[in-house]
């Protein structure tokens, strides 16, 4: 049992090292994109599928309620919560069509597999001239292909299973810390 515990935490540490090394530039770009939108008075919309829906909600909470410092909240809305009563591939798109504006940012967290509702919401964001940050996973080639030149993709496809969610969690925390630092300064 001790060996299994050690292997579990060793894989978590290795994942953290890969995330910090391989994704630093993309994480910085994502944080800059979200920060610029917030400073311009725009909103951040988040959504995800499967277990990634929880990570999208967490990012909205970090923006709206604060991450590591006490501060005023930022305008962040989780589309999953707003689309709870809807079903089908257009459920996220319908909410985005109603509430989002050009220059807002959509952050999408995918658990993998080219989720049709996520493809649809990305297409809607493109039609509305929004910026997109995509935290993708394995088999998300259609999601990635939908992105524009100025959008940001952080692909966690090299990780498997729970390590994908762990990597995405760390990325969300890092983006949140960078946003707070860029807007409020500090260490």
Where are these regions (language model features)?
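Glycine-rich phosphate-binding loops that contact phosphosugars or nucleotide phosphates
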Residues: 45, 49-186
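Catalytic cores of large soluble enzymes that bind and process phosphate-bearing ligands
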Residues: 4, 22, 26, 163, ...
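A short, well-structured juxtamembrane/interface segment
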Residues: 19-40
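Generic N-terminal amphipathic, Lys/Arg-enriched alpha-helix
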Residues: 1-21
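A ubiquitous structural signal for well-ordered alpha-helices
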Residues: 8, 15, 30-33, 59, ...
């Amino acid at each position: 049992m001790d060996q299994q515990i050690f292997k579990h935490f060793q894989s978590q540490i290795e994942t953290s090292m890969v995330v910090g090394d391989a994704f630093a530039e993309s994480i910085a770009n994502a944080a800059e994109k979200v920060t610029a939108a917030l400073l311009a008075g725009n909103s951040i919309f988040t959504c995800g599928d499967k277990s990634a829906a929880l990570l999208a909600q967490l990012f909205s909470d970090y923006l709206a309620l604060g991450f590591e410092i006490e501060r005023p909240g930022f305008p962040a809305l989780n589309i999953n919560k707003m689309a709870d009563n809807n079903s089908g591939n257009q459920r996220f798109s319908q909410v985005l069509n109603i509430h989002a504006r050009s220059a807002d940012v959509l952050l999408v967290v995918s658990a993998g597999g080219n989720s049709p509702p996520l493809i649809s919401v990305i297409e809607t964001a493109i039609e509305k001239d929004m910026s997109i940050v995509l935290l993708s996973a394995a088999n998300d080639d259609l999601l990635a292909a939908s992105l524009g030149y100025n959008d940001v993709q952080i692909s966690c496809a090299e990780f498997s299973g729970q390590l994908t969610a762990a990597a995405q969690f760390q990325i969300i925390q890092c983006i949140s810390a960078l946003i707070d630092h860029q807007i409020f300064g500090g260490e």
